[in-house]
């Protein structure tokens, strides 16, 4: 018999197949996040995979426009885009489909976007987003809701050692505008401030014609990072009204976050330059210990829906699900997925009883698979272990009597006999599990 040669079936760079174990973990993460969103009164929207390029581009910054996948639509003759971010889609939907509905809109979503990545960057072109948008409220309370939900979702996933960095584009924008620097110089300075590169900031300022007072104001930005005391230092540094209003806004949000009980996870970074061309107020990013990239990010964007003809204040944030997956996989102490509960191993010729037991277990909410392939006990146990199944229930055979099943804990092979009548009773539970050899 001629051996079959496996075909080569490579994937494009920047995308991957997620096999059952990782797919389970992604579903687990998304489910935990969605539960928090729903508890806060947010309702799900499912956005399309395609948009007309000119429509989606109206809601994108220059960076995301450059990363958007485009192609010609055979039906309309127009340019089609695969969205590189879901928030502009939500803005379009609110401005058109939900225009007549009362405000505020509490919307959540979960989906994938595509972004071009630099050839040598090694970054994924496929991004899993789970996020919320609160549209129609311009208040510190709305901003505080976003931050609190981010904290609650991270705690729900089992994280304890994480921080949410709070910034405010109004603060840094006010200082930059008051400086009167040329746009090119301002962009260089913002990049250096964002990297916390103090020497580069000083070098750029040394070449500028600004007064010593203005230089001191700008040079202070990279060090305005820490706890609430940063606001006092920033108040001494900033002299313009825009920056002072931003500090007052952050202070109000912090008061509310203290009431929500999440202050222990907060830091303030007034040198944050992310989203200066997009955000309009408070911004934030979430970081988990051991991860260099943010696992969530968001903030206020009061001008986005106006680009679609419906001016409304808005705030929101999104989780990077794959970043969360990487963080969870580095933490063996954190549950990262829901494993399968039971594998039914039938050693009887008659299938009826095994089928009935499996059906009963599913009614009780236990995920239950049958090992339909005929194999021995050890091979079935090995299969259960490799498929990440917690328990194997043996029906028939030498391990149990005619009125019993044998329940095995897959992790260590320990098992116990259980009466079949108990399996069909309301008191049956897997919580305790086998605790002794029988």
Curated annotation (Swiss-Prot):
Cell location: Cytoplasm
Principal location class: cytoplasm
GO CC annotation: cytoplasm
GO terms (BP aspect): L-histidine biosynthetic process; tRNA aminoacylation for protein translation
Pathway assignment: Amino-acid biosynthesis; L-histidine biosynthesis; L-histidine from 5-phospho-alpha-D-ribose 1-diphosphate: step 1/9
InterPro entries per record: aa-tRNA-synth_II, aa-tRNA-synth_II/BPL/LPL, Anticodon-bd_dom_sf, HisRS-like_core, HisRS/HisZ, HisZ
Keywords: Amino-acid biosynthesis, Cytoplasm, Histidine biosynthesis
Assembly behavior: Heteromultimer composed of HisG and HisZ subunits.
Descriptive protein name: ATP phosphoribosyltransferase regulatory subunit
Organism placement in taxonomy: Bacteria, Pseudomonadati, Thermodesulfobacteriota, Desulfuromonadia, Geobacterales
Name of the coding gene: hisZ
């Amino acid at each position: 018999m001629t051996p079959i040669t496996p075909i080569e079936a490579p994937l494009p760079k920047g995308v991957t197949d997620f096999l059952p174990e990782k797919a389970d973990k992604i579903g687990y993460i998304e489910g935990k996040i969605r539960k928090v969103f729903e508890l806060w009164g947010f309702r799900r929207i499912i956005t399309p995979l395609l948009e007309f390029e000119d429509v989606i581009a109206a809601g994108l910054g220059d960076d995301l426009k450059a990363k958007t996948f485009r192609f010609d639509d055979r039906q309309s003759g127009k340019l089609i885009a695969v969205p590189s971010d879901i928030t502009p889609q939500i803005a379009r939907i609110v401005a058109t489909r939900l225009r007549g509905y009362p405000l505020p809109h509490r919307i959540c979503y979960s989906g994938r976007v595509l972004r071009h990545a630099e050839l040598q960057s090694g970054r994924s072109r496929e991004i899993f987003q789970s996020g919320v948008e609160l549209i129609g409220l311009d208040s510190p309370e709305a901003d505080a809701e976003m931050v609190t939900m981010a904290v609650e979702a991270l705690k729900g996933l089992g994280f304890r050692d994480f921080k949410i960095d709070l910034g405010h584009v109004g603060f840094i924008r006010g200082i930059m505008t008051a400086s009167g620097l040329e746009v090119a110089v301002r962009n260089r300075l913002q990049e250096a401030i964002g990297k916390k590169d103090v020497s580069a900031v000083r070098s750029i300022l040394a070449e500028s014609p600004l007064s010593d007072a203005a230089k001191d104001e700008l040079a202070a930005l990279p060090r305005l990072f820490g706890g609430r005391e940063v606001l006092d230092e920033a108040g001494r540094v900033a002299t313009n009204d825009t920056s002072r209003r931003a500090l007052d806004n952050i202070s109000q949000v912090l008061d509310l976050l203290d009431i929500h009980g999440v202050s222990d996870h907060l830091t303030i970074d007034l040198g944050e330059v992310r989203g200066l061309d997009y955000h309009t107020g408070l911004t934030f990013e979430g970081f988990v210990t051991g991860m260099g990239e943010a696992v969530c990010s968001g903030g206020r964007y009061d001008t986005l829906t106006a680009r679609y003809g419906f001016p409304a204040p808005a705030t929101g944030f999104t989780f990077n699900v794959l970043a969360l997956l990487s963080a969870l996989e580095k933490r063996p102490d954190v549950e990262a997925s829901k494993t399968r509960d039971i594998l039914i191993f039938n050693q009887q010729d008659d299938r009826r009883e095994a089928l009935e037991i499996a059906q009963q277990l599913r009614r009780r909410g236990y995920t239950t698979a049958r090992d339909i392939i005929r194999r021995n006990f050890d091979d079935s146990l090995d299969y259960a272990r490799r498929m990440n199944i917690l328990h194997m229930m043996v029906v028939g055979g030498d391990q149990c009597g005619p009125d019993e099943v044998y329940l095995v804990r897959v992790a260590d092979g320990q098992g116990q006999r259980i009466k079949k009548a108990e399996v069909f009773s309301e008191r049956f539970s897997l919580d305790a599990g086998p605790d002794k050899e029988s």
